[in-house]
Design a protein with these regions (language model features):
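Short beta-strands and strand-loop turn motifs
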Residues: 42-44, 80-84, 111-116, 144-148
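Terminal accessory/targeting
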Residues: 4-15, 72, 139-189
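Alpha-helical scaffold elements lining the catalytic groove of polysaccharide deacetylases
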Residues: 48-74, 87-142, 155-158
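Active-site beta->alpha N-cap acidic-glycine motif
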Residues: 1-77, 83, 166, 173, ...
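Residue-level signal for short, function-critical loop segments
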Residues: 20, 87, 150-151
Length: 189
């Protein structure tokens, strides 16, 4: 909720990729995200590489499970998916084109990022998160910043407002990913 408070106070829209196993208990947060005009995308149901990425059908079913939960519980039709570890990850190399096409067939576009806060790796600090974002965002007209809002990523919350203010000062705008002129992809088929 604190993330949403900051986004609301700064007039910023964001895209949240949800993990299905974490939806239970976060229903009010997801409802608030939707009501405030944020976008909800599918990340995965369980976020365990060996389970979800063992083959194309297993991963497809994992994503569809979350898409169906969002539709049933929130009447929300998710149109984006973010592959855990990105679309160029080695787990899906044998079926990457197939899964991307299957997602497209049901109206799911995939999204990656071009700037990472690296806030889910090791023991991030406020300084390291800011440095990771600063070193890359200037390279893009439309930076897509990957940040995490769950788990042990409390440092991200502590710098979110500073990141927004700095980017606004540099002339950057904010919106949901589906409104970008072009999706950010690591892999193009």
């Amino acid at each position: 909720e604190k993330y949403l408070d900051i986004l609301e106070s700064e007039g910023v829209k964001a895209t949240f990729f949800v993990i299905g196993q974490q939806i239970n208990g976060e229903e009010q947060t997801i409802k608030r995200e939707i009501s405030q005009g944020h976008e909800i995308g599918v990340h995965t149901y369980c976020h365990e590489a060996d389970r979800i990425y063992c083959n194309c059908d297993t991963y497809y079913k994992d994503v569809i499970k979350v898409k169906n939960i969002l539709k049933k519980q929130f009447d929300y039709d998710a149109g984006l998916v973010r592959f855990p570890w990105g679309s160029a990850n080695t787990y899906i190399s044998s079926y990457r084109d197939n899964i991307i096409q299957r997602f497209k067939n049901i109206g799911l576009e995939y999204a990656d990022w071009n700037v990472s806060a690296e806030d889910s790796v090791g023991n991030p600090t406020q300084t390291s998160i800011m440095q990771n974002i600063r070193k890359d965002y200037v390279r893009y007209d439309e930076p897509v910043i990957l940040m995490h809002d769950s788990g042990a990523n409390k440092m991200t919350l502590s710098v979110l407002n500073n990141i927004i203010l700095e980017l606004k000062e540099k002339g950057y705008g904010f919106d949901v990913l589906s409104k970008r002129s072009k999706c950010c992809h690591f892999y193009e088929n």
